[in-house]
Regions:
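Hydrophobic core of transmembrane alpha-helices in multi-pass small-molecule transporters
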Residues: 21, 90, 101-117
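Helix-to-loop junctions at the C-terminal end of transmembrane segments
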Residues: 62-76
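Short hydrophobic/small-residue motifs within alpha-helical transmembrane segments
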Residues: 54-61
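Intracellular juxtamembrane helix-capping segments at the cytosolic ends
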Residues: 116-130
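C-terminal ends and interior cores of transmembrane alpha-helices
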Residues: 85-98
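Helix-loop junctions at membrane interfaces in 12-TM secondary transporters
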Residues: 10-11, 95-106
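Extracytoplasmic
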Residues: 11-50, 63-67
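Helix-breaking motifs and short loop linkers at transmembrane-helix boundaries and internal kinks
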Residues: 43, 75, 96-101, 131
Length: 141
């Protein structure tokens, strides 16, 4: 196997990998870890939690459908910084969640900037930066 590609492009591979794994904060598997605590703290049922999660996810998907194309229109660095800061903001905001409305907003933000934008952006950057070796890059992720 030819490892020269990985050594010469390590910097870019690290950036796309960090974005890809940073998306974990908005992924179902990560949020599900805290679902029991969220239900307990808010005194809500499984059904109510599922509805909140579904609403945040659907709103996020609708906005992602509308705004997903901006990943190809704006500078990658600026967009990456915006996504990371926004995702961190919604993670931090979870500390202050005191009502259902704020919880829905937080779930929306985590799903949009994590599951949606960070993972989409990492794949778009793979396509932009590695047009000839896109397959190798995606396999690396």
């Amino acid at each position: 196997m030819n490892n020269i590609f990985y050594y010469t492009n390590l910097r870019w591979l690290v950036i796309t990998t960090l974005l890809y794994f940073g998306a974990s904060f908005g992924q179902t598997f990560f949020i599900a870890i805290f679902a029991g605590y969220i239900r307990y703290d808010f005194h809500i049922s499984h059904t109510t939690w599922g509805s909140i999660y579904a609403l945040g996810t659907c709103l996020s998907a609708a906005l992602m459908f509308k705004l997903g194309g901006i990943t190809e229109k704006f500078k990658s660095v600026n967009l990456s910084i915006m996504v990371i800061i926004s995702l961190a903001f919604f993670c931090f905001l979870m500390i202050f969640a005191e009502n259902i409305v704020l919880l829905i907003l937080i779930i929306f933000g985590l799903r949009f900037f994590g599951q949606g934008f960070a993972s989409d952006l990492s794949m778009v950057l793979c396509g932009k930066w590695f047009s000839k070796n896109r397959g190798k890059t995606v396999a690396f992720l």
